[in-house]
């Protein structure tokens, strides 16, 4: 079977079975969330932009927000026959892309995104196997659904497996 590469855009998500790859680019302060069921060989990838939807009304794209995207991704995976108890997560991104003179948490969207993703994964009882968070460089996340492997390409730093 030919391996298909499926792009996941900003504020987007997708699912795939083995042996396909889900790829998202442009993870600066955004966070990529790869969820994988080893038993079924099925996974999903979400690219979130913001930590929390509660400050917004009339939400047109719930995948933009960590608190909404993770439960939606889990639901989509369950529709494909995944058992939520088998899901494991790998996450990347959450960089501080801009140097603000105000170092308050409100300005550090990358850190807030990372914290929100960890919180919602814990709430959904999905353990995090590995992470590549923080720093100040953009990342690309490549999720191989055949084994659940995630490679991170960081600007100026090469590729590593998490």
From Swiss-Prot:
Top EC class for this record: hydrolase
Task of the protein: Probably deamidates glutamine residues to glutamate on methyl-accepting chemotaxis receptors (MCPs), playing an important role in chemotaxis.
GO molecular function: protein-glutamine glutaminase activity
Keywords: Chemotaxis, Hydrolase
Name of a matching Pfam family: CheD
Name of the protein: Probable chemoreceptor glutamine deamidase CheD
Family annotation (InterPro entries): CheD-like_sf, Chemorcpt_Glu_NH3ase_CheD, Cytotoxic_necrot_fac-like_cat
Top-rank taxon: Bacteria
EC number(s) from the headed UniProt entry: 3.5.1.44
Protein family (similarity comment): Belongs to the CheD family.
Native organism: Clostridium kluyveri (strain ATCC 8527 / DSM 555 / NBRC 12016 / NCIMB 10680 / K1)
Catalytic activity: L-glutaminyl-[protein] + H2O = L-glutamyl-[protein] + NH4(+)
One GO BP: chemotaxis
